[in-house]
Amino acid sequence: MHRMKKLLYLFFLANPLFSSAQIADSAKREVKLQGAINFRDVGGYATKDGRHVKWGKIYRSAELNNLTDADLLKLQQLGIARVDDFRGPFEVKLAPDKIPLNATRIDLPSGSEHIGDSGSSFSKTMMKGNGDLLMLNFYSNTAPFANRYRPVFKELLQLNPDSALLFHCTAGKDRTGIAAALILYALGVNEKTIMRDYLATNYYRTSENEKAISGMVKNYGMDEATARKMTEAKEKYLNATFVSIIRQYGTVNHYLESVMGLDKKMLQKLRTLYLN
């Protein structure tokens, strides 16, 4: 019980409101593209031991189906060689990726198989107006994580030193946000910074979220409050992931070792590769 209270305290320290400094820090890492939003570098964050995550090695984004030729050239120049897609088959069919020349795309749809399927229980729950409950359940369900995120860590450990990796989903918020949080935690970034990176999605998707909310209300008859819950990144959502991990595995480090394959040797290698 004491450990759980401590965990909740640590992960609720982050302020859900953006200060100007937080926005500036987030904005400088944005990769501006014509055909994609919420595309940013995960580098630059300080770790607990005084090092920093390397810039230009790990990127996160929303969907990539509208990338222009200029965008693709920019991603090629960034050295992006691996593109991990967390979306399910319905999402991929609706908005197929465009990827830079010579990059390899990897499908990692675990847990997303029925997202976008109007007949699925996920969609039915969403339409009933249980937005908050749906999101909390989604974040706390760690069962799909092994097949979704373990390959990402494996790729990071094997990536060519001159290359970069990009991971994404549809909005670049939930599945992508969890991936970024686990990677940053493994690299030794503190919880407050991890939460700020996660919440930055609300800043980058401000106008897009309003469009999405209007579309949900107009096209699906969803009430605005439920639609807003579906589009926002909230502290309690990401907290639900870490609380679930702690309940099952005792510590996040034990989870990273037993489920993500990051024993002490692999964790040290990961930090050597991606910290300076």
Where in the sequence are the language-model features?
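Bacterial Sec-dependent N-terminal signal peptides
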Residues: 1-23
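Intrinsically disordered, low-complexity sequence elements enriched in Ser/Thr/Gly/Pro
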Residues: 1-4, 38, 58, 173
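Cys-dependent protein tyrosine phosphatase-like superfamily
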Residues: 21-165, 179-276
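Ser/Thr-glycine-rich phosphate-binding loops at phosphate-binding pockets of nucleotides
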Residues: 170-176
